[in-house]
Amino acid sequence: MSKALLRYIRLSPTKARLVAREVQGMNAELAIASLEFMPNKAAKVISKVIASAVANGGMGAENAVVKSCRVDAGPVLRRFTPRARGRATPIRKPTSHVFVEVVEQSKDK
């Protein structure tokens, strides 16, 4: 089992979790290929983390299975934008931590 972790990525955890759920339990090679055609920013990020986890384990992508793909919330950058009558409203810029675990596929399948 090998792991990869990407922290403080400027990405909404809610949107990233939608992509992370799609690849859980998939073959790593198939997961990377399917993420390549998704239009989300999260797809590109998660694809790189899966590739990193496979490389960390020293195995080929065709022999690896995504055991878990988890997206946790990181700190939120708070900015303010000016509004009418001298007021200011907050802008939330969320960050995420992406965690991927990859295991080697069993030979009997």
Swiss-Prot record:
This is Large ribosomal subunit protein uL22. GO terms for biological process: translation. The gene is rplV. It comes from Wolinella succinogenes (strain ATCC 29543 / DSM 1740 / CCUG 13145 / JCM 31913 / LMG 7466 / NCTC 11488 / FDC 602W). GO terms for cellular component: cytosolic large ribosomal subunit. PROSITE patterns: RIBOSOMAL_L22 (PS00464). InterPro entries: Ribosomal_uL22 (IPR001063), Ribosomal_uL22_bac/chlpt-type (IPR005727), Ribosomal_uL22_bac/org-type (IPR047867), Ribosomal_uL22_CS (IPR018260), Ribosomal_uL22_sf (IPR036394). The lineage of its organism: Bacteria, Pseudomonadati, Campylobacterota, Epsilonproteobacteria, Campylobacterales. Keywords: Ribonucleoprotein, Ribosomal protein, RNA-binding, rRNA-binding. Part of the 50S ribosomal subunit. It comes from the Bacteria. Belongs to the universal ribosomal protein uL22 family. One of its GO terms (molecular function) is rRNA binding. This protein binds specifically to 23S rRNA; its binding is stimulated by other ribosomal proteins, e.g. L4, L17, and L20. It is important during the early stages of 50S assembly. It makes multiple contacts with different domains of the 23S rRNA in the assembled 50S subunit and ribosome.
